[in-house]
């Protein structure tokens, strides 16, 4: 069996707080294979970005506690890796595309210098070779006048251009995994589509695995091979993207999809999931979604496991899986 690029198993993480520990991740398991584009979906506070930052080991030291679980990157232990090893991995094995490129790029340095620094940090090549590679990467991202862009500062580029630069940077050292944390949220819809197409094309051409984090099921449906849905720090459904979107089993996934506006239907009243997300400091016993769930029953007083509930290895953490059919 082929070794997965990323393998997360039964991860539990909390942050200390004045009113008790905040249980940000609860028994999270996730796998990504070479060349696969996987979506991680959920509303704000569900644990998506915490998962991404932990994979990169970018959470401040001492600010969190991993109670149990493991993260393996190409078979190597991420959680116990030393800082020197992490510096070698970041960029070369795993890279990240952040939501807001203006805060990710250095505003005081020209684009070309930033790209060349990253390339030469991981590859023993000359400045001339690094410059040529940077220009090639920018041209692959369909950036016009790539040579001119090399001499510009981030603030001189549009949001879409900056995000293309970030994608080029992420691929610059040919990592096996790229984590894209809502990279198109701040972009116009037309620019968003262009950036997604570039990301997908480059990932397919290079065989790079991608973990794509989003709250938008429509975006995920265009890009991802499979999807994991998170709620209150837990994965509550996973499977092939088409199966999860058109045949969701978990009531939360169904609610998430029904909240999306339909194209061509003007002034519709959107349905909403009743109630609020539970306090992660004091999670309820049993299923975290049961107080908001229309299908809740007596079994929901116990925590459900993520088990098979459909075709193509679709799984959901629900005692009463649904048979909903959604048109998206």
UniProtKB/Swiss-Prot annotation:
Residues 6-257 form the ABC transporter domain. It comes from the Bacteria. It is found in: Cell inner membrane. One of its GO terms (biological process) is protein transport. GO terms for cellular component: ATP-binding cassette (ABC) transporter complex, substrate-binding subunit-containing; membrane. The complex is composed of two ATP-binding proteins (DdpD and DdpF), two transmembrane proteins (DdpB and DdpC) and a solute-binding protein (DdpA). Pfam families: ABC_tran (PF00005), oligo_HPY (PF08352). Belongs to the ABC transporter superfamily. One of its GO terms (molecular function) is ATP binding. It is a peripheral membrane protein. Induction: Induced by RpoS in stationary phase. ATP binds at residues 42-49. InterPro entries: AAA+_ATPase (IPR003593), ABC_Ni/Peptide_Import (IPR050388), ABC_transporter-like_ATP-bd (IPR003439), ABC_transporter-like_CS (IPR017871), Oligopep_ABC_C (IPR013563), P-loop_NTPase (IPR027417). Part of the ABC transporter complex DdpABCDF, which is probably involved in D,D-dipeptide transport. Probably responsible for energy coupling to the transport system. The keyword S-adenosyl-L-methionine does not apply. This is Probable D,D-dipeptide transport ATP-binding protein DdpD. Keywords: ATP-binding, Cell inner membrane, Cell membrane, Membrane, Nucleotide-binding, Peptide transport, Protein transport, Transport. It comes from Escherichia coli (strain K12).
